[in-house]
A protein has these predicted regions:
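Divalent metal-coordination and catalytic microenvironments
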Residues: 43, 53, 77, 89, ...
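Short Gly/Pro-enriched turn/cap motifs at secondary-structure boundaries
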Residues: 31-33, 119, 139-143
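Metallo-beta-lactamase
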Residues: 49, 145-195
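Conserved beta-strand hairpin/beta-sheet module of binuclear metal-dependent hydrolase folds
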Residues: 12-68, 149-164
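Active-site metal-binding loops of divalent metal-dependent hydrolases
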Residues: 25, 54-56, 78, 104-105, ...
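Short, well-ordered secondary-structure micro-motifs
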Residues: 31-32, 110-113, 150, 174
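Short acidic-hydrophobic surface loop/beta-edge motif
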Residues: 7-12, 21, 43, 124-130
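Active-site HxH/HxHxD metal-binding segment of metal-dependent hydrolases
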Residues: 35-37, 49, 56-134, 158
Length: 195
């Protein structure tokens, strides 16, 4: 079940909104399968936006986007719960929207999509625009080798950080599975987020 999208931030400077759409589906890794919820973020203006992690339910995410132009699909990492609906979502947008993800997670991408194009690479410090919102890519390996967060320093009173599974409420993201490392996630959070 997908929950109705909610506006979590409205920034009158530039008419920017941040909306959250919670989707449900499965996460599969290391021979296991778990029911999970994922936060899908829609960041931008009434005319255009970027979508971060369009997980599980492309129809619901497309409905939340409404009539806006999606300039980018941004992926925080390559686990299947975050990426397995991406191609269907992009196809429903017309097939031309760029998908960006750290290439440190290409092995995870190719496990879901063995054929076809890989996403465009994201790199630490890269600058992007989501509508009129400036986003900075911060590499935060640990949950996966290519995990990143997106920092919007000009949103709200203190900036906004879109963390994917790098940071959960109460602590760091999950580790203990293939390609993850607790020590690495702590180090990357200290370096990229807390400093």
């Amino acid at each position: 079940m997908t929950r109705q999208p909610e506006t979590v931030l409205t920034d009158p400077r530039g008419g920017v909104t941040v909306e959250k759409c919670v989707t449900e589906g499965t996460f599969n890794l290391d021979g296991g399968s778990w029911e999970v919820e994922n936060n899908v973020w829609i960041v931008g203006t009434a005319a255009e936006c970027a979508v971060i992690d369009p997980a599980h339910d492309p129809g619901a995410v497309l409905e939340a986007v409404a009539n806006r132009t999606v300039t980018h699909v941004l992926l925080t990492h390559g686990h299947d719960d975050h990426i397995k609906a991406v191609r269907q979502f992009v196809d429903r947008l017309g097939g031309e929207t760029p998908v960006l993800m750290s290439h440190e997670d290409l092995m995870l991408w190719h496990a879901v999509y063995p054929d076809g194009p890989a996403p465009e690479p994201l790199s630490d410090g890269q600058q992007l625009l989501a509508g009129s919102v400036a986003l900075t890519v911060l590499a935060t390996p640990g949950h996966s080798p290519g995990s990143v967060v997106f920092h919007a320093p000009d949103l709200g009173d203190h900036g906004v950080l879109f963390t994917g599974d790098t940071l959960f409420q109460g602590g760091p993201g999950a580790t203990g599975r293939s390609f993850s490392s607790f020590d690495t996630i702590i180090e990357s959070l200290q370096k990229s987020v807390l400093d």
